[in-house]
Design a protein with these regions (language model features):
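Substrate-gating cap/lid alpha-helix
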Residues: 173-218, 244
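Histidine-centered active-site loop/cap adjacent to the catalytic His
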Residues: 234-264
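Basic, amphipathic N-terminal segments that precede the first structured/catalytic domain
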Residues: 2-97
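Acidic carboxylate-rich catalytic motifs and surrounding loops in phosphoryl-/glycosyl-chemistry enzymes
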Residues: 165-167, 210-230
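Oxyanion-hole/transition-state-stabilizing segment in secreted/luminal serine hydrolases
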Residues: 87-138, 168-175
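Short catalytic/ligand-binding loop motif for oxyanion handling, primarily in non-cytosolic enzymes
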Residues: 34-37, 61-64, 110-115, 169-175, ...
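Short amphipathic alpha-helices and their capping/turn segments at secondary-structure boundaries
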Residues: 38, 82-103, 146-158, 207
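Surface-exposed cleft-lining segments at the edges of enzyme active sites
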Residues: 118-148, 182-195
Length: 264
């Protein structure tokens, strides 16, 4: 009888070519989200490693967002409409478990209300303050902002959360010495340098860290004249609109890169 030889196919393990799932990122904010979107659309910052959604509202509608039943929700039909327009994904509310990472951007935590008075006071002849007093003042300022409290709640619920504050006013748009802006009342702050600002940035970071939130300070190389953002970061049309608050897509890209660096 002829011998029959059967060829046996050996199975070899082949590593999967599928990529790991992207992390999900939600950027929560107010009108400053506009510069983030323009930066993303222009390819100024790379978020290819994330499935990203924007969430928030502009103007008065942002004040109608609140923490209700454990989620950040709009409290009026107008605010719901504003949120859905910005989000574009039909997400009317966000909860701590909805995303891998949250970044609160701008969100009314205004550095122009914190830095000038603090730096001015610290520059007075008898203006030195203790670390404990600085910590208490910083915590009072941070917790006075609703979005910061929401960020802390999310972190307390187990979410990975970061906060990038509203940046300092833009230089070169108006004459701050003549304009009716509170920053003109703190002239000593205008001479502050990076070492003088450092304790304030650290106090902000410490306050957020105590609640489990990462803090993204405004990069020092974007700051000039003590308490101002450099003029080249003004958005298009800022001079005509006298807009010292909002920033360009290039500035948003700088902040987003700082945020991404902090993730690593």
């Amino acid at each position: 009888m002829a011998r029959m030889i059967c060829a046996v196919k050996r199975k070899y393990w082949v590593p999967s070519q599928s990529k790991p799932p992207k992390k999900t990122l939600c950027i929560i904010g107010d009108s400053h989200l506009g510069s983030v979107k323009r930066a993303l659309d222009a390819g100024l910052v790379d978020l290819a490693g994330f499935d990203t959604e924007l969430w928030g509202a502009q103007g008065p509608a942002f004040r109608q967002l609140n923490l209700i039943d454990g989620a950040y929700r709009a409290q009026s039909p107008q605010a719901v409409e504003a949120v859905l327009q910005i989000n574009g994904q039909g997400r009317a509310h966000v909860a701590p478990g909805d995303f891998d990472i949250f970044l609160f951007y701008g969100a009314r935590l205004r550095m122009a209300e914190f830095m000038p008075p603090m730096l001015h006071h610290m520059a007075l002849p008898n203006g030195a303050i203790s670390r404990a007093v600085l910590a208490a003042a910083t915590e009072r300022f941070v917790r006075g902002t609703r979005a910061a409290r929401v960020a802390m709640h999310f972190a307390g619920a187990g979410a990975r959360v970061y906060f990038a504050p509203t940046p300092l006013f833009t230089d070169g748009v108006i004459d701050f010495e003549k304009a009716r802006w509170a920053v003109r009342d703190f002239p000593l702050a205008w001479a502050a340098d990076a070492p003088q600002r450092a304790p304030l940035w650290q106090a902000l970071a410490d306050t957020f860290a105590a609640a489990g939130v990462g803090f993204v300070p405004q990069p020092e190389d974007t700051i000039c004249r003590g308490v101002f953002t450099k003029a080249n970061y003004a958005p298009e049309g800022a001079l005509d609109a006298r807009d010292v608050v909002h920033k360009s897509p290039e500035f948003a890209a700088v902040m987003m890169r700082a945020f991404l660096a902090g993730l690593n």
